[in-house]
């Protein structure tokens, strides 16, 4: 079930402050955040975010296609290695 339209989207307040400050200064320095739950708004377009994935910060450059998605969708937390099978050594 998706979020009600009348409630609007969710963005952490501290992240909005960082965006407003960067927009006023015209800075394109990466913005470090742990807020994976924040929704990407049109104000975020053109900025680079360093989104924490639980271990490290992943650089995410925001484009127009990402608006409406969450920041955490673009910083994966799990790495798929491979299922078991024959390896080069076994051949």
Swiss-Prot record:
Keywords: Ribonucleoprotein, Ribosomal protein, RNA-binding, rRNA-binding. InterPro entries: Ribosomal_uS19 (IPR002222), Ribosomal_uS19_bac-type (IPR005732), Ribosomal_uS19_CS (IPR020934), Ribosomal_uS19_SF (IPR023575). The keyword Hydrolase does not apply. GO terms for cellular component: cytoplasm; small ribosomal subunit. One of its GO terms (molecular function) is structural constituent of ribosome. One of its GO terms (biological process) is translation. It holds the Pfam family Ribosomal_S19. Protein S19 forms a complex with S13 that binds strongly to the 16S ribosomal RNA. PANTHER family: RIBOSOMAL PROTEIN S19P FAMILY MEMBER (PTHR11880), SMALL RIBOSOMAL SUBUNIT PROTEIN US19M (PTHR11880:SF8). Belongs to the universal ribosomal protein uS19 family. This is Small ribosomal subunit protein uS19. The gene is rpsS.
